[in-house]
Amino acid sequence: MRCADDAPSSDRGPGGGRYGARGARILGTGSFLPGLPVTNDEVIAAMGGDRTTSEWIEAHTGIRSRHWAPSGMATSDLAAEAALRALEAAGVCASDLGHILLCSTTADWTSPAAANRVQELIGASCPAEDKQVACASWLFGLDHAARLCATGTDPVLVLGADIKSRFVALDDHRLRPVFADGAGAVVLGKGADDDQGLLTVRLVSDGSRAMNLYTPAGGSQLPASERTVADGLHFVHMAVSGREIKQHAIEIMAGSIRWVLDEVGWGIEEVDHFVAHQANLAILKGLTEELGVGVERWPITIDHTGNTVAATLPCTLDEVMRDGRVGPGDRIIMTTAGAGYSGGAAAYVVPS
């Protein structure tokens, strides 16, 4: 079969049409970080060695502390806490929700969907489902939710939640200090097409690099066994250098941001806030340099949250909306990149 365009999605230019789910509104946000902050010194002590220092971790990742979920707490527990806070902020009852999307790489089980447990915990009765696109999960979920709203299913609860600390080897000095736990939530509702709310979303997937950063075991390709556990194959593995992952992440986010700006007709200087996934501070700084945008327009949360994977974007949104840094009329670009490779960007105007 001959196809009109065999180029990967990351190489395709703007579609030239209006975003089909344009105008969806964020009605409320919420977030939850479990337990007490875990300092760099505590991470080093947990690793049981002297392969790194607190100063090295902060200098290379930007992280001073992060949160790790206590034993007995599952991803759905974190998600439910964030959900209740977002529902309260939105003034929406759980019983009025039209759909729940739980975006996560660390669902409670392989089956059923952990979103079903969230539904039960918050007292909802609507359809609920999981979405897994690594660190880009929540942005993919936001696009899905906006399309649900556009077709009459609203409001939609979009959750990003992960307990990634349990999927990193204890002695992995590169990743153990970085990955953390948390949950963020947004209640999304339908809005008018009046140049406010969600204006467009760009999503990118590049399966040719799927094995660069992945968890080898636990799925259908390599089911759990005594050997996979003994070999540590249920932990995150980096098959390429951190430098290469950084370069690819910057390429995905910068390209997606430029596409979105072109689609909505904004100059980069017209954006008030860039809310980005924060895998580490070096990637974020590299992105600001690539785009020529001062770091003051990029809210930084990784210093006290670590990399919360799918929770990063909604947690950062919740923080800046609650502390007053974001106000009516502000133009926001959201962007992310993660394993898969997957990523993208979105343009949002805070409704007046």
Identify the role of each PLM range.
Residues 2-71, 172-247, 251, 255, ...:
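Condensing-enzyme catalytic core mediating Claisen C-C bond formation in acyl metabolism
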Residues 27-30, 103, 132, 156-162, ...:
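Short beta-strand segments
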Residues 50-58, 109-123, 158-164, 224-230, ...:
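Acidic-glycine-rich active-site phosphate/pyrophosphate-binding loop
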Residues 76, 80-83, 87, 106-107, ...:
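Claisen-condensing/thiolase-fold acyl-transfer catalytic domains that form or cleave C-C bonds
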Residues 95-103, 268-277:
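Short glycine-rich phosphate-binding loop at a beta-alpha junction
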